């Protein structure tokens, strides 16, 4: 299924609702869908959804970026501003042992690629960050996987100080 990712600068004064309305309008124009109900609601776990359920969405923000991914199928989006501080301890605590070994071998340079891949996947599944975050791996001996349990992971090149992944 096609996914549309809309990115906004956080200094953009529009509300989350108006940003989502613009993203849904862009998606609807591109894929010729109708979604007149652009009312944002939240599931008990905090995952946002559109009242009409005609289009799935995922929202993320970090640093100066805010983004929204839209698709007819479940979707997960994560944006991270790269910060070097504390990545080793975070990886040791939250990542799968295979991922931690991979990061040790690569000097933790791919930490944010792995983090955004993992977070986009758990947003895709609707689980969010739970105790199961270390139960799955997004790497093998060759590096970052292109999919996890049949769900495609796609890193989106953008500004060098950010990592963005959609699942």
Predicted regions mapped to residue ranges:
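Core catalytic alpha/beta fold that binds nucleotide/phospho-ligands
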Residues: 1-167
């Amino acid at each position: 299924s096609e996914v549309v990712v809309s990115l906004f600068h956080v200094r953009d004064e529009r509300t989350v609702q108006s940003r989502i309305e613009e993203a849904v309008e862009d998606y609807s124009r591109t894929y010729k869908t109708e979604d007149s109900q652009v009312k944002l609601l939240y599931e008990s776990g905090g995952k946002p959804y559109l009242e009409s359920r005609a289009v799935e969405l995922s929202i993320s923000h970090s640093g100066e970026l805010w983004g929204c991914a839209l698709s007819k199928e479940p979707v997960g989006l994560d944006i991270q501003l790269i910060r070097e501080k504390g990545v080793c301890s975070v990886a040791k605590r939250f990542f799968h042992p295979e991922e931690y070994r991979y990061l040790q071998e690569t000097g933790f340079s791919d930490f944010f690629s792995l983090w955004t891949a993992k977070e986009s996947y758990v947003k895709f599944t609707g689980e969010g960050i739970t105790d199961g975050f270390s139960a799955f791996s997004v790497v093998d001996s060759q590096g970052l996987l292109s999919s996890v349990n049949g769900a495609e992971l796609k890193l989106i090149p953008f500004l060098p100080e950010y990592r963005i992944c959609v699942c």
